[in-house]
Amino acid sequence: MLIAHALGMTTPSIRPGHPADIPAIAAIYAHAVLHGTASWELEPPGEAEMQRRFEAILAGGYPYLVAERDGDILGYAYAGAYRPRPAYRTTVENSIYLAPTAQGLGIGGLLLDALMQACAARGFRQMIAVIGDGTGASVGSRRLHERAGFRLIGVAEKVGFKHGRWLDQMLMQKELGEGDRSPPGL
């Protein structure tokens, strides 16, 4: 059950992101950069850079979704290229960020489910989650992905340094659509 609904809150709608969402998206991301390890950036980018990134995701044919309730953006999720080489063209990497007040309410699961559906509909076959060090919000991210059927495929140890400590990085993977049961449409 969606915890937000159990608390008497209306279920947020999941919809494609729009340029008007960029200020809220930038604020959510800035908080993640400054206070967490989901992003390994050290300084939050400004709205102009977030707009550029948003446009690049859409121009690449990838989905960019937001969770909205009563006009407030509670979180966002998008997929992008896992790696730039052509053989990776059917594999995407996901990113999900939630406003601090939206964490732990089931909204991440709504975003992830919608993102997986949107990626499968576009013909992507594998989704990779690159998850920070396994503490704080990263614990929630791992649980979120496990509940969605992702499996841990590896841990790179002590590969990042942020907030005065070394960070591990987890890789999780989930098959989408046809997975590897047939060759991709070329």
Residue ranges of predicted features:
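A short beta-loop-alpha structural element at the N-terminal edge
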Residues: 13-25
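Acetyl-CoA-dependent GNAT
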Residues: 16, 44-101, 112-113, 118, ...
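Conserved GNAT-fold acetyl-CoA-binding loop/helix
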Residues: 26-53
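Conserved catalytic-core motifs of GNAT/GCN5-like acyltransferases
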Residues: 78, 130-132, 142, 146-167
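C-terminal "cap" of GNAT-fold acetyltransferases
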Residues: 92, 158-186
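A short, internal acetyl-CoA/4′-phosphopantetheine-binding micro-motif in the GNAT/acyltransferase core
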Residues: 95-104, 131-135
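Conserved acetyl-CoA-binding loop-helix of GNAT-fold acetyltransferases
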Residues: 104-121, 140-143, 147
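Conserved GNAT acetyl-CoA-binding A-motif
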Residues: 119-133
